[in-house]
């Protein structure tokens, strides 16, 4: 059962809540998520299971696609509706033109300060833990890239946005900073993740669907097998003898199986589609197995 289960995370659950639930359903402790979703958020939460947990390192900067609802009129401590108001509530009447002009500042590459209430670490502690103790937290800005930021709808003080962004981008910060730029305050009211890396919403199962599959002994139906993960990495097909050598740490060439891939990493895969290892280039046309399955 090595692979990824894509969950449609329900609102109100932490990502760790979902991991614990799937551990019980799949009857294994080897489950982890590939990127936190806030409790108020729903949508795509990919979970690595069994030996595929070894591949999590390759997903840390996966691009994301979100659809979010921003409420203008006041800001909050967490930059979303779960936080305490930090500004006086004001009546807001924005035009689409005003909003489009402000959105232009949040497209492309820029420095973004993460919310104080986040999973970022400060001297070894999660910043949200410090914030809950009323300790002052101001995280350093980080470079993010927003490839697309589209205004889908504007009604009253609510704006629906769609964003395609780099890993590590906070939609809560975009909402908060947008309110600051417009001088009226704002926070994130709703958030749905439509895609995370190669995983999309149409692949996602609810926890109830996953439980039903497990009850019918059909849990593998919900798993994207390890051999199909990381499609951006070129595949090098190997026979069983070479596969055994790679599992023992032996370097392997890309040819004669295929021409040298223009990639730092390749996947060593058997003819039956099983992932043997992820290889990292060490010499032209020679790869070292950095992760062995």
From Swiss-Prot:
Catalytic site: 38
Name of the protein in question: tRNA pseudouridine synthase B
SUPFAM superfamilies cross-referenced by the UniProt entry: Pseudouridine synthase (SSF55120)
UniProt-listed InterPro entries: PsdUridine_synth_cat_dom_sf (IPR020103), PsdUridine_synth_N (IPR002501), tRNA_psdUridine_synth_TruB (IPR014780), TruB_C (IPR032819)
GO MF annotation list: RNA binding; tRNA pseudouridine(55) synthase activity
Source organism of this protein record: Solibacter usitatus (strain Ellin6076)
Keyword annotations: Isomerase, tRNA processing
Function: Responsible for synthesis of pseudouridine from uracil-55 in the psi GC loop of transfer RNAs.
Pfam families for the chain: TruB_C_2 (PF16198), TruB_N (PF01509)
């Amino acid at each position: 059962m090595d692979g990824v289960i894509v969950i449609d995370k329900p609102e109100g659950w932490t990502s760790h809540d979902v991991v614990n639930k799937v551990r019980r359903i799949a009857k294994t402790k080897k489950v982890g998520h590939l990127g936190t979703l806030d409790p108020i958020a729903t949508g795509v939460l990919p979970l690595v299971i069994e030996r595929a947990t070894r591949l999590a390192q390759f997903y840390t900067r996966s691009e994301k696609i979100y659809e979010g609802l921003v409420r203008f009129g006041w800001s909050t401590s967490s930059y979303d509706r779960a936080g305490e108001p930090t500004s006086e509530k004001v009546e807001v009447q924005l035009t689409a033109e005003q909003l489009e002009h402000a959105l232009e500042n949040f497209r492309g590459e820029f420095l973004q300060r993460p919310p104080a209430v986040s999973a970022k670490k400060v001297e070894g502690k999660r910043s949200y833990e410090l914030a809950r103790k009323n300790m002052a937290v101001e995280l350093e800005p980080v470079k993010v890239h927003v490839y697309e930021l589209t205004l889908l709808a504007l009604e009253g003080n609510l704006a629906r946005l769609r964003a395609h962004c780099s890993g590590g981008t906070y939609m809560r910060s975009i909402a908060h900073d947008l309110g600051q730029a417009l001088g009226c305050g704002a926070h994130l009211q709703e958030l749905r993740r439509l895609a995370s890396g190669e995983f999309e919403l149409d692949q996602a199962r609810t926890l109830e669907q996953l439980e039903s599959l497990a009850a019918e002994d059909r849990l593998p139906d919900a798993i994207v097998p390890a051999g199909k993960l990381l499609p951006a990495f070129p595949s090098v097909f190997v026979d069983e003898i070479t596969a055994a050598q790679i599992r023992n740490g032996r370097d392997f060439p890309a040819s004669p199986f295929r021409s040298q891939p223009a990639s730092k990493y390749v996947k060593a895969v058997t003819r039956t589609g099983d992932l043997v290892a992820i290889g990292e280039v060490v010499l032209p046309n020679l790869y070292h197995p950095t992760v062995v399955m």
